[in-house]
Amino acid sequence: MIIKKRILNTTTKSFVSLLAIVLTVSTYACAQEVSPSPEQRVILVTGSTGGLGRETALALARGGDHVIIHGRNVQRAHQVIQEIEEDGRGSARFYRADFASLEETKGLAIAILADYDRLDVLINNAGVLLPDQEERRVTEDGYELHFQVNYLAGYVLTGMLLPLLEASAPSRVVNVASGQRPLDFDDLMLANDYNGLEAYFRSKNAQIMMTFAMEADLSKRSISINALFPSGLMNTDMVIEAGFEPQSSVETGRDALLQLVNDDVGTGKFFNVFEVGEAIPQASDIEAQQQLMRVSEELTSVRAAEAGK
């Protein structure tokens, strides 16, 4: 696979290019100006206007945390915010960003960097599973949709929000994964023999590989990182709209996710619901991890962490 090199280190970007991104920041933040108290944990839950993300965000707020709500649907986000405000134990603020756009993903990170001085937990939960398994969709950046939304967006956020995670250390990153299929680095975007479910599982494997790859580097910064298969085919809109029959509850997935947020579970692990699980062999392959990190940097112009360091 030939990848166009588009590395632009954030410290060397032209002023005009950086200014263009900064000027878009205001479009991502909602109107609320709610700030966390010093006693509250600050937790970003991507994809938190529905499904697992929504249930997790509400549970965290009930525990007294300040939750950064992310999604695309403003109306659904306001409903989540309203529930949190009516409960009164936690607080929240909403940011809108479409992860099918690297510009919007980076704009979200820039907005959060501008509005917060710390981040205790980053939960990379947002995901997509297309109902049409034969229609290959490409983002505005030219990348296969599942790979960008499910994996690259979380990679970008993890890299760009490292200063806030370090400011809150010990802090945590949790990648919400699923079943896995090995990546084909010669056809990373599935241009040949496309299958939507295959694309979904490969993107989830990339999340787990990222978890293992970043573990050593992030540990030096007192940041833990773990991946989770929350539960199989939960009763979420994404699963139902993709045409699958739900086989488990979103509450089970929520509780499994909360375990990684709240409990001392270590770092660099893949959890199958509540227990440590076994990922596919490629996920533990150091050379494959390093290759994924190199490719991710090339595709996004963001360096998140050194693989295996």
Predicted ranges, named:
Residues V42-V45, L122-I123, V173:
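Conserved hydrophobic beta-strands of the Rossmann-like cofactor-binding core
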Residues T49-G50:
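Conserved glycine-rich cofactor-binding loop
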Residues G53-R54:
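N-terminal Rossmann-fold NAD(P) dinucleotide-binding loop
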Residues G63-Q79:
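Conserved glycine-rich Rossmann-like NAD(P)H-binding loop of the short-chain dehydrogenase/reductase
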Residues D87-E103:
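Rossmann-fold cofactor-recognition segment
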Residues G127-F147, E166-R221, F229-A242:
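Catalytic loop of short-chain dehydrogenase/reductase
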Residues F244-Q282, I286-Q290, R294, E298:
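C-terminal helical subdomain
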